[in-house]
């Protein structure tokens, strides 16, 4: 009985000891896992943040434009592991570290083998390093040629394994491994040597990259355009080992017998330098200010632009040819931008004729330079006028000497054409009609319109006045491209996009669809310069406008064709003048050279441009642009916005009853047997003067001083042209007697005299077209009225202010 109790006690005691041991083991295991969890949860920087990264700038199709250097002058792209070729990842582990997924950061067998060969047998040094140890050596810049350095490398490898997962360590190694010269990382090497991202590598390329880090200096040598013998031999040995695991890949054996193209580092592309520079600057600014950039795992590696490399090369080629061909005319520099109006993506951008030419300041991005646009803003004056009911495309405007207060614009050719339709005035770039339209605008005027369109750094509206219409302000080429794209997009303004990941913002309506359509239709009627000499018109409609800045510093052409907007500039960045810098002569030929080249390379298709439903066609009298009366001999059609466009019955053609005996206008009552009726053109006095100066005969309506309103049926009232509406005239305090304000007005052909009144007080009489000068006695508000000798009148307010 006692023996049984003793045995039972021994059994219980033994079981207790085993239970205690198991508890200790479990506690130890839990402690280890707890320590591992604590290490993983302890804050530590991502491995990608240990070293700076490069940026691969690519076009919309993924073609490399530029690979930037990291801050430490290395080419180093960070590519996530899931964007690496699986064949490359497996080949690296097969070649470098087959036990990677199982060891704790170091491989005891590998270390022992390396020590035996290096120190005992005296062979070539072998470190026995794992991928983790190689990463540790690079991150901490360790000297591992000594036993102490090797021990520190092992410790650092264990540290990495404690704080990071295997996938994170593998990803970091692949992005940090040396690939010859200053190229680091498999993703970088893939882009540099094979011009492709690492997820698109072929098997021969993947195996070649896998063996380079073991001896990069010998396996990658500069100046070669294919892999050298040392690299090919190492790759093929790895391929033999690869086949033991993947016998199905034996079908690729012929590829391993062929030379493998390998781009030398010196041949890295440097395309679209101005556009890439702008995109990188915008990216850096965005990353500085945007919190979203911190969460963008691919932000440092790849910048996808909206550029099309083929279109970029075409634009660069055409500019280079044009500048070379026109060198004798003093043309040294040019710039251009091409924008797709459908998504506002910049497809090609050339900031200068030669980025590397210091003589022309070639590194300046001309598309961002603020310069006088000349007449390229005129289409928007007319479009605003359409929306505000000032005119329609066939409105007849006056191209005559006109003073708008102190501002008296002249035309580029120094001549005046008299009556001209709005369409012809725009396409022939007449200054006086454009300024008159601008003077009639209310809100928005051109200045407010440009502000709404995002044009920056404008001076005050008072600084420019009406001169803004003719290029008195400064805009950039990119501003112009966005404005012309707005016309193509039916009046909806959207900013340009250079990065593919920039969101396409909702359009902001600045013009009506009707006004935009009419303006485009006007520009479409502008013949290209070589059409006048018999050249064939473009295969697609081209909606274009030229511009020339003051003193011949800038020549511009901007326009729409197919889905694109193209703006070209010819000039000098140092603002030197050249009489050859005229828009139609210097910029338009380059513009159409580019249009023709693009159409030859890819057939351009005109997008649908349906007539807006609110836009109507109306019959007009061609001489006046108004609704035809019964005596109008030539009639046509014009676009018309019901309820907005100004329209009235024409009064240019009128019947006059002629006395058969005298040939003068007959006095009422008329004797039908002794009179007859003829149709005459009644032109205002200012236009009659232009006709006379141009030598264009105009049969004047006969007059008869013996009777009032002899034979005349109707007529237009006079129209005040000075003082200018909305202007304040300054009167100096100590020299009030020197202040004289010019009164002037145009009048109907039937008017012979004009009578001027200020606040209903008669101040003088003059002939139509002659100026009358009035001297105000005090500052204040006045009403100026003019009455012709038929009782027809016009009036407007006048403000006179004091000035020290």
Kindly give the residue locations of the regions a language model identified.
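Soluble, non-transmembrane domains of envelope/secretory-pathway proteins that act on or interact
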Residues: 2, 36, 58, 246, ...
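Terminal hydrophobic membrane-targeting helix
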Residues: 41-87
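Short pre-catalytic segments that frame enzyme active sites
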Residues: 63-77, 188, 215, 221-224, ...
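Flexible, acidic/glycine-enriched loop-and-adjacent beta/alpha segments
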Residues: 80-131, 184-194, 199-206
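Non-catalytic, structured segments within soluble enzyme domains
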Residues: 123-313, 410, 448-461, 466-471, ...
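A penicillin-recognizing enzyme superfamily signal
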Residues: 305-328, 336-340, 349-352, 357-366, ...
């Amino acid at each position: 009985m006692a023996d049984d109790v003793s045995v039972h006690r021994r059994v219980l005691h033994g079981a207790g000891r085993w239970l205690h041991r198991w508890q200790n083991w479990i506690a130890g295991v839990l402690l280890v896992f707890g320590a591992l969890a604590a290490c993983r949860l302890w804050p530590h920087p991502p491995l990608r943040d240990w070293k700076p990264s490069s940026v691969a700038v690519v076009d919309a199709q993924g073609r490399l434009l530029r690979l930037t250097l990291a801050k430490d002058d290395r080419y180093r792209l960070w590519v996530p592991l899931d964007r690496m070729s699986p064949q490359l990842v497996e080949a690296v582990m097969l070649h470098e570290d087959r036990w990677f997924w199982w060891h704790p950061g170091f491989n005891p067998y590998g270390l022992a083998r390396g020590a035996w060969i290096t120190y005992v047998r005296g062979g070539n040094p072998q470190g026995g390093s794992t991928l983790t140890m190689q990463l540790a050596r690079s991150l901490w810049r360790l000297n591992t040629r000594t036993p102490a350095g090797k021990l520190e490398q092992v410790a650092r490898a264990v540290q990495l394994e404690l704080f990071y997962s295997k996938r994170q360590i593998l990803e970091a190694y692949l992005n940090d491994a040396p690939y010859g010269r200053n190229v680091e990382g498999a993703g970088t090497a893939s882009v540099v040597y094979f011009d492709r991202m690492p997820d698109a590598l072929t098997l021969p390329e993947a195996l070649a990259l896998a063996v380079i880090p073991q001896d990069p200096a010998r396996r990658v040598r500069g100046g070669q355009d294919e892999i050298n013998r040392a690299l090919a031999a190492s790759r093929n040995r790895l391929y033999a080992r690869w086949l033991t695991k993947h016998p199905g890949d034996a079908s690729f054996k012929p590829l391993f017998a062929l030379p493998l193209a390998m781009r030398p580092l010196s041949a890295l592309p440097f395309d679209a330098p101005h556009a890439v520079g702008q995109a990188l600057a915008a990216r850096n600014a965005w990353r500085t200010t945007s919190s979203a950039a911190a969460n963008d795992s691919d932000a440092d590696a790849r910048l996808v632009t909206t550029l099309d490399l083929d279109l970029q090369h075409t634009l660069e080629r055409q500019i280079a040819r044009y500048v070379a061909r026109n060198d004798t005319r003093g043309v040294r520099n040019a710039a251009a931008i091409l924008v797709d109006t459908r998504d506002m993506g910049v497809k090609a951008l050339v900031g200068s004729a030669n980025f590397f030419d210091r003589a022309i300041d070639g590194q300046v991005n001309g598309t961002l330079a603020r310069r006088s646009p000349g007449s390229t803003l005129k289409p928007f004056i007319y479009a605003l006028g359409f929306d505000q009911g000032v005119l329609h495309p066939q409105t007849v405007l006056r191209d005559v000497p006109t003073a708008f207060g102190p501002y008296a614009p002249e035309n580029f050719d120094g001549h005046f054409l008299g009556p001209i339709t709005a369409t012809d005035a725009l396409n022939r770039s007449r200054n006086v009609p454009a300024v008159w339209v601008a003077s009639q605008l209310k809100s928005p005027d051109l200045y407010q319109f440009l502000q709404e369109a995002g044009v920056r750094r404008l001076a005050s509206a008072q600084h420019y006045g009406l001169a803004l219409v003719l290029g008195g302000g400064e805009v950039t080429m990119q501003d112009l491209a966005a404005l012309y794209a707005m016309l193509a997009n039916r009046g909806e303004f959207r900013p340009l996009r250079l990065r593919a990941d920039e969101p396409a913002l909702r359009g902001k309506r600045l013009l009506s669809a009707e006004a935009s359509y009419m303006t485009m239709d006007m520009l479409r009627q502008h013949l290209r310069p070589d059409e006048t000499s018999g050249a064939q018109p473009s295969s697609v409609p081209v909606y274009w406008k030229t511009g020339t800045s003051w003193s011949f510093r800038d020549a511009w052409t901007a326009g729409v064709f197919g889905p694109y907007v193209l703006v070209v500039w010819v000039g000098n960045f140092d603002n030197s003048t050249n009489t050859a810098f005229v828009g139609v002569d210097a910029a338009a030929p380059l513009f159409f050279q580019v249009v023709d080249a693009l159409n030859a390379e890819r057939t351009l298709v005109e997008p649908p441009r349906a007539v807006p439903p609110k836009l109507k066609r109306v019959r007009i009298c061609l001489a006046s642009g108004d609704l035809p009366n019964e005596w109008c001999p030539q009639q046509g059609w014009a676009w018309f916005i019901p309820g907005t466009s100004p329209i009235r019955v024409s009064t240019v053609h009128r019947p006059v009853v002629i006395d058969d005996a005298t040939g003068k206008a007959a006095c009422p009552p008329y004797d039908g047997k002794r009179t007859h009726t003829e149709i005459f053109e009644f032109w205002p006095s200012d236009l009659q003067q232009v006709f006379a100066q141009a030598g264009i005969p105009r049969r004047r309506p006969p007059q008869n001083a013996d009777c009032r309103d002899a034979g005349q049926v109707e007529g237009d009232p006079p129209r005040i042209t000075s003082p200018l509406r909305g202007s304040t005239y300054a009167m100096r305090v100590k020299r009030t007697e020197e202040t004289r304000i010019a009164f002037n007005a145009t009048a109907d052909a039937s008017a012979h005299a004009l009578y001027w009144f200020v606040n209903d007080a008669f101040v003088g009489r003059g002939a139509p077209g002659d100026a009358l000068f009035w001297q105000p006695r005090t500052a204040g508000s006045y009403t100026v009225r003019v009455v012709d000798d038929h009782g027809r009148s016009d009036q407007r307010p006048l403000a006179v202010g004091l000035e020290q």
